[in-house]
Design a protein with these regions (language model features):
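Thiamine diphosphate
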Residues: 1-174
Length: 174
């Protein structure tokens, strides 16, 4: 794992504490370099059951099943992974009114030098809007504190909700 700065550790700790405040018990994750410190923190924290999965749809299925077991959960993935899950989300979670809380990264925006993520920057939020999937865009540190409210909204609606993090927030620079 790359070296993690003190600012990044602090941002990660703040996010983890918001998960605890939300009552999250299970986290299903897929690797993404922007959220690697968060995945590592959740994995090492006894307050969570962390399940690494190999496909985004597996995280969707696991977290949806956890709902029926009364276990508050989170699917943690990159932006590309989220875009591949749209069918599963609309088929399972929308059809059967299953809440699903998702964290994703905001890739392909100004400042992201990786050309293979440009489509995420262009289309991710528009795609979510097109299927009426609410999201909280976290581009400033103070917005992290809204995570429990987003989780509560997701549960109240019995529908998915996404929290999308900018790289600056995850690095502790915003």
């Amino acid at each position: 794992m790359p070296i993690v700065s003190d600012k990044q550790k602090e941002a990660t700790s703040l996010i983890v504490e918001q998960l605890v405040q939300s009552g999250i018990k299970l986290v299903a994750s897929l690797p993404d370099d922007w959220i690697a410190p968060l995945i590592d923190a959740v994995d090492k924290d006894d307050r969570f059951k962390h399940v690494p999965v190999n496909r985004e749809e597996s995280a969707i299925g696991l977290c949806s099943g956890a709902f029926f077991g009364g276990i508050p959960s989170l699917a943690l993935m990159g932006a590309s992974g989220l875009t591949t899950c749209i069918y599963a989300i609309t088929k399972i979670n929308y059809s059967y009114h299953i809440p699903l809380f998702i964290f994703a990264t905001l890739r392909g925006v100004i400042g992201d030098p990786r050309p293979h993520h440009i489509s995420n920057g262009l289309y991710l939020t528009k795609l979510l809007d097109s299927i009426s999937l609410p999201f909280l865009l976290v581009e400033e540190r103070k917005t992290i504190e809204r995570i429990p409210a987003a989780f509560k909204h997701c549960q109240a609606m019995n529908r998915p909700e996404v929290v999308i993090f900018s790289e600056a927030v995850l690095l502790g620079d915003a």
